[in-house]
Amino acid sequence: PVFYNGYRGGKEISGPSDPDDAGAIGNVPAKTTTSVHALGIENMAQQCVQGRGVMIDLHAHIGRERVAVGYDRLMRILEQDRVVVEKGDMVLLHTGFAQMILEMNRHPDGHVLENACAALDGRDRRLLQWITDSGLAALIADNYAVEAHPAVSHDGCCATLPLHEHCLFKLGIPLGEIWHLTPLAVWLRSHKRSRFLLTAPPLRLPGAVGSPAAPVATV
């Protein structure tokens, strides 16, 4: 089979040879037959990830309430804070979730955390279309999935994480999760800014589809 951009299965992209190797259920195996070769994270490490970051401070408007933020609410927040997202921007969503984890001082309360802080509504088709139309280059949050997980209930098919499907599979937009954004968000708001230089190289892991990043904001 030929994937998007003309990459070929079994050559540039190798899937698992056994379902147990997919890592979707249970423990992830120590070894894997999966490799993305041409699309490995090492390519991002070699070129680095650097450009204009744009902070959207959801926490400033919503606090730590568990809310699935759809298109309408996101647009109101952008308008109120005079935030403009342009083509090529790396968009960061500050929800306060990572800050909550740190405040629990290595004793996280799972029940509290699973009912805390905002996340994007991946089922909102207008929100997904905005991601496409805006031309943003990366979507990053300080929560564990960027979008609400489990996703908002709906009728019909299909994706468990629809925003992941839209960004990663359809558009090739990388996602960042569990970044500690609160100190930066507080500084930007106190200086009436939303933009900064973001440098966020991943680790050079040949064939891997993801990696921890080492992000630095220059203000």
Could you tell me what each predicted segment is?
Residues 1-219:
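Active-/binding-site microenvironments in catalytic and ligand-binding cores
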